[in-house]
Structures are given as C-alpha cells and as structure tokens.
Amino acid sequence: MATNIKGPAIFLAQFAGDAAPFNSWDSITKWAASLGYKGVQIPTWDGRLFDLKKAAESKTYCDEVKGVAKKNGVEITELSTHLQGQLVAVNPAYDEAFDAFAPAAVHGKPKERQKWAVEQMMLAAKASKNLGLTATVSFTGALAWPYTYPWPQRPQGLIETAFSELAKRWKPI
C-alpha cells in the first residue's frame, strides 16, 4: 500500500522565534536537518519563515523556498493553517480569546476576522499547489468547543470576573 507520509518531520511553529536559528527559513531548516528530521511543516502565519501571499502568487518564490529546504537537507511536508482555520468558525463566546490569532486590524470584528481567515485558507490552497503539495493541515474551527473543551485557555481572571458580574446582577434581586 502506497503512503504519502514523509518524515520523520517536525512542525516548526513551536520553535519559530526572533533568535537564530529559529528566525529565518534558511537557518531553521538547517537546524531541523541537524536533528535528523527529513521533513518540515511550515506555519503559514509566521512571516519570518514564509510569505503566504507571495507563495500563493508566485511559483518562483515557492521554488526558491523548496530549494532552500532541499539544500539544507529537508523537504516541505505540508503547509499549516491551524490558526487561520480555527478562525473560520469561532463560537461567539470565544470571540475575544480568538482575536489573538488574527491581525489587529480585525480584532473585535468577528465577520471581518472570519473573512480574513477564509482568504488565508484560499491563499494556502494556492500556495500548496505552487509548492507541489497534495495535503495541508489545519483546524476547522470551534463552534461547539465551549461545550466540550476549554480552549483556547481562559484568560487570567475570567472566572473571577464572571462571578463578580453575577454578584452585581443577582444581589439586587
């Protein structure tokens, strides 16, 4: 049976940062290869590593990105759109918490945030095609999550604030 699994591979999002070797595509792919990884999954929201819009529009850019990975001893396994995909379907109870995953320009504007997320997903599909990838990884959103799992984590003081508000409303009654 044929398989499309490539690896071992590593998801780069949790390592990307402002310090070398985690702050550029060239250095992070060298780092991943030095650890024995054969593949890398690119977080499409991190502009230090990848320009999603440019990748959707330019096969040349995608060829350059693939070339750097190959030169450094790894291949791209998938593009990751976990954060953007999550924003396609946010339960209104979580609007404020999920704003942290979107650009400031759409904070507090759920419809605009969702539109931005859908656009990001479309760009990722085009970029994946330009990279020659046949799969992508994402989250689908969390319309039912408030009823099943507390994610994203509650901000500090949320429960205390809720009980204080309940007290204000019910004490007069």
Could you describe each region identified by the protein language model?
Residues 21-26, 53-67, 115-120:
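Aromatic- and glycine-enriched glycan-recognition loops and surfaces
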Residues 26, 31, 71-75, 86-173:
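Active-site acidic/histidine proton-transfer and metal-coordination neighborhood
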Residues 5-8, 30-37:
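A short, Lys/Arg-enriched amphipathic alpha-helix followed by its capping loop at the start of a domain
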Residues 2-24:
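Boundary/entry segment of secreted carbohydrate-active catalytic domains
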Residues 41, 78-80, 137:
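Conserved beta-strand positions in the central sheet of alpha/beta enzyme cores
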Residues 41-67, 85, 140-148:
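Glycine-rich, proline-tolerant flexible connector loops at the mouths of alpha/beta enzymes
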Residues 35, 43, 130-131:
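Structural motif
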